């Protein structure tokens, strides 16, 4: 029988070294059901990361599985050269829930490509290659997305055709404004934005792109209203606002369907990916028609909106809405916060617990300060696994543990995860 160790050996032989699986002894994922996965050895784990927030409503969800199986028996692929009812129906659903007026959607296979398309639209619409992004941001692995990623451990190159400036925003713990209250913090960030625009731009910036909650950046969560305050300054100068909803969309934050809705702003564009396919590759960019129609040459996507992915997206989005999984995210998120915040406050090496809905993170530092403790983060991550819980890592210094349960997680499953976290914290000491 093949073992996880066998697969790890084969993995290292054929895959690039920059792909680093989790854990000192990597585990295989052989099968899943609901909030649980099993490895090849039959060990069961409670999955609080969902393949980086991508399995969103549970492994092997019956509605998604049935939709994919039904579509696979008809046709797997058509491309955008032909009419496809699943693609059109999914696009209609996304436009309806986007909140963007007169919306159009361009479908892609990944969030990186969605952000690339948004940048193409913005720079074409504004006839400018100048982009604003947020410090500690991550927007993908394609060439253009690397330029707007403010995260040294994820930037493979400094070369770019874009002129990018980074402003203060989401990552409050290490901000020079961290001791300010929400209102003063927001005002200071707006002042920084104005100064960057006045000092470093040529006056015709194309767009700002921002994550409402920074994903790879360790679920760094800005004060509500920050991007709305930015938006007032941007709109005065004709600058577009792009909300990267790859990790925050579809009700994940509980209080809102989209992360941008916490900020009193409607973006000119939003990008999405990950969870809406519940594990099947599906992404896209939504924009007002006048922006989308800026591109007047032929465009094409081989795999974007393919029938199989669209079928998965339709089933996932229907489930999210019909079962009010946004509401469940809010209730379960509050349950998680009530249980874990006292534990985090009492743990000297947890510098900050942050997040909302079903997006939570612990930033792990030297006791009593904010010096990153990457080694202890690794110990905690391994301890969670030993207690049967799969969680993610992230943060600028690799010292953040991220948790993102399924949107339909039950109270019993959540409590099981909380018990595992407490046990892991006790083990690390």
Q: Which sequence ranges carry the predicted segments?
A:
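Conserved N-terminal phosphate-binding loop of PLP-dependent enzymes in the Aspartate aminotransferase
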Residues: 1-429
């Amino acid at each position: 029988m093949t073992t996880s160790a066998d697969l790890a050996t084969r993995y290292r032989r054929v895959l690039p070294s920059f792909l680093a699986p989790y854990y000192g002894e990597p585990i295989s994922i052989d099968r899943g059901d609901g909030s649980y996965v099993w490895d090849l050895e039959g060990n069961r784990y409670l999955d609080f990361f969902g393949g980086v927030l991508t399995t969103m409503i549970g492994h092997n969800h019956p509605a998604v599985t049935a939709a994919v199986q039904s579509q696979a028996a008809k046709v797997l692929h058509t491309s955008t050269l032909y009419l496809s009812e699943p693609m059109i129906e999914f696009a209609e659903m996304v436009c309806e829930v986007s909140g963007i007026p007169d919306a159009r959607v361009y479908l892609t296979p990944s969030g990186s490509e969605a952000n690339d398309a948004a940048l193409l639209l913005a720079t074409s619409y504004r006839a400018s290659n100048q982009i604003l992004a947020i410090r500690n941001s991550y927007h993908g692995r394609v060439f253009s997305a690397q330029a707007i990623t403010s995260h040294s451990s994820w930037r493979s190159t400094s070369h770019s055709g874009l002129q990018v400036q980074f402003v203060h925003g989401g990552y409050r713990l290490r901000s020079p404004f961290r001791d300010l209250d929400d209102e003063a913090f927001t005002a200071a960030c707006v002042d920084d934005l104005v100064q960057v625009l006045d000092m470093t731009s040529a006056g015709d910036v194309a767009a700002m792109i921002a994550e409402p909650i920074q994903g790879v950046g360790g679920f760094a969560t800005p004060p509500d209203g920050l991007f709305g305050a930015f938006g007032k300054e941007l709109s005065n100068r004709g600058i577009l606002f792009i909300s990267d909803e790859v990790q925050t969309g579809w009700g994940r934050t509980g209080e809102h369907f989209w992360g941008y809705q916490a900020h009193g702003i409607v973006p000119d564009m939003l990008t999405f990916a990950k969870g809406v396919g519940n594990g099947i590759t599906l992404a896209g960019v939504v924009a007002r028609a006048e922006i989308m129609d800026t591109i007047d040459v032929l465009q094409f996507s081989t795999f974007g909106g393919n029938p199989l992915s669209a079928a998965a997206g339709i089933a996932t989005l229907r489930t999210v809405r019909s079962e009010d999984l946004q509401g469940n995210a809010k209730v379960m998120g509050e349950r998680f916060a009530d249980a874990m915040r006292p534990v985090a406050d009492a743990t000297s090496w947890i510098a900050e617990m942050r997040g909302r809905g079903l997006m939570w993170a612990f930033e792990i530092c030297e006791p009593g300060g904010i010096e990153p403790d990457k080694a202890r983060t690794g110990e905690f991550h391994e301890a969670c696994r030993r207690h049967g819980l799969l969680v993610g890592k992230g943060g600028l210094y690799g010292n953040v543990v991220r948790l993102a349960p399924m949107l339909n997680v039950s109270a019993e499953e959540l409590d099981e995860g909380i018990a595992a976290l407490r046990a892991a914290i006790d083990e690390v000491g």
